[in-house]
């Protein structure tokens, strides 16, 4: 209850800061004297300039201690005292692992004092402000727990990561203790039931109050002391084992496998491929690594199905220890659900969600299966024909014939489905038109067109970021000024999470007159003079930068990378525009099966030809991408599209089943049984479910991704398909969905966006309506 966080994320003190002086506000592109490069693009594409500006900013801070800090490309207002070396996110505590511990202890002291006030202040004014104070308590805890969640995933210093884990466990336990606090729960119920008090509350306060009351009850606040104690311990254990599970999802059962040289050499595999492989010391076997480039090359190039199956199985299998972690996680969750009176964790978790019940989720997924399975089978038929011909097989059932280790090999043989290897005849590589800076500028331009906001780069203070290649962006509204901050950690680096992620570091909320300590937050100002806690988020990706021409390094994106970046920026957009009075409902703090909607809608923009043509720019010439080249790549990107969607359906069903079974010892059998039941590219060879990391973060709610894909497809068709740059459509989506965060019923938001009032009920008809979508 007190902490609601999602990855999927000192006052901004009003001060005059001198602009970093550039020789020109726009700089010439390499190789094209007539083209110009925007400051935002240059921040990501000109590594030398970035390093120079970082160094100059640090030097300026050291030379001007106590004076205004040096930002470049944009001004921001502030009145904070300047220091030569701040901490992460301008929090002065966060300059060392020990500083993080001090910040956690400071927050714990503040939380303890606030809890005492909540328990003791029974005055009329105290009761009227009770929900606001509960929200402030939640904010104190969130700003430690969410921060630590981020640091564990991204900070390069192992000591910082260890401190983050320690502080996370400490504050998470406090949160669970508060979740079961009987006194706090009863007083909240009193506030909501007393009309003399509730009549003085805003609609947002009442909604937060009801949500918090439901969370109290879900945590067992009315249960016996023994049950509450069990809830606290189980929740703590789930958090710890879940983090351990996440940390090991990339660990394979073995780092390599051995294949006899005679088998591989007689398989028909190209000698060019074989020359890239190493042999064991005796020279009798090839040592095939289970990660990296080599195994994928064999899946594409080896004619032997037996060898492909062996390689594929090794690539997607985890250790027995990892399977045990998953079993423990599932057992703990089932026990927690049972002591709370639920039959299983699925039923427990779906309370309060859009889907409402396991039966509704099941019906939704079955609707998708009925629509998608025939389409997936049709896509695989072309590959099945090739397999029949190559191996002289008589099997006519495509789904029985095609296995997951066949897909890449027969795709490489098919003239109709072969993916281009970065090039189309007569053209340069497609990624040369989508440098990281070009795409970031394109996203900013799109946001400006449809939402009236844009992105501006600023140089962070020394110590404000955790790695030298992190870029800091201000989010600027046409009407409100600076509304939020995004820290972009987009380039690959050892030790950081491999999953693209949006981390909320600090939620937006209203600042109250009695608050005067802004040393650990950044504060924004509304047009009416009121102040708000600046939303701060971090975006994590692992794009690769390489040397290109005169550039020290340049990051060029494939179309799939462009979609990834648009997706994560969709989460960021939600965090920036969903600035509610109370942080409990700010931005992405909405129900789980609604949170992916803004990000998946952004994927539609990333796939739209009109958008891509507008934002593209060759990094060397400045020319837009040729439409013929873009069309060719987009056609190839639709390769096995429905088959990929069906794999998401299978994962959603697996999540539901694993969280509803009574015997967790049979999880591999459950996985294999579901694969055989679903029939499409059946995997009955691996224990891949142990590598399915979303079973922790999206436990019993992984269906949310598909549900939001279906909703996003309908919203795209209704609002943006005709004109993706429409300001009126953007305003409708912003006013109907984005600005509310979680402060409005999700079905009401969707009903308004789609102009379909019947959806407000969120009943069986609504679920079927969402599930009946032609193109996800």
Curated annotation (Swiss-Prot):
Names of the cofactor(s): Zn(2+)
Instruction: Tell me which GO cellular component terms the UniProt record holds.
Output: mitochondrial matrix; mitochondrion
Question: How are cofactors bound according to the entry's free-text note?
Answer: Binds 1 zinc ion.
Q: Reaction(s) catalyzed by this protein?
A: Release of an N-terminal octapeptide as second stage of processing of some proteins imported into the mitochondrion
A biological process from GO: protein processing involved in protein targeting to mitochondrion
Its main subcellular localisation, reduced to a broad class, is mitochondrion
Active site, renumbered: 568
Instruction: State one molecular function term (GO).
Output: metal ion binding
Positions with biased composition (Polar residues): 53-71
Q: Where is this region: Disordered?
A: 48-71
Q: Kindly list the positions annotated as binding Zn(2+).
A: 567, 571, 574
Entry EC no(s): 3.4.24.59
Top-rank EC class of the record's enzyme: hydrolase
PANTHER family with a match to the protein in the record: MITOCHONDRIAL INTERMEDIATE PEPTIDASE, PROTEASE M3 THIMET OLIGOPEPTIDASE-RELATED
Protein name (Swiss-Prot/TrEMBL): Mitochondrial intermediate peptidase
Organism per entry: Eremothecium gossypii (strain ATCC 10895 / CBS 109.51 / FGSC 9923 / NRRL Y-1056)
Print the organism lineage.
Eukaryota, Fungi, Dikarya, Ascomycota, Saccharomycotina
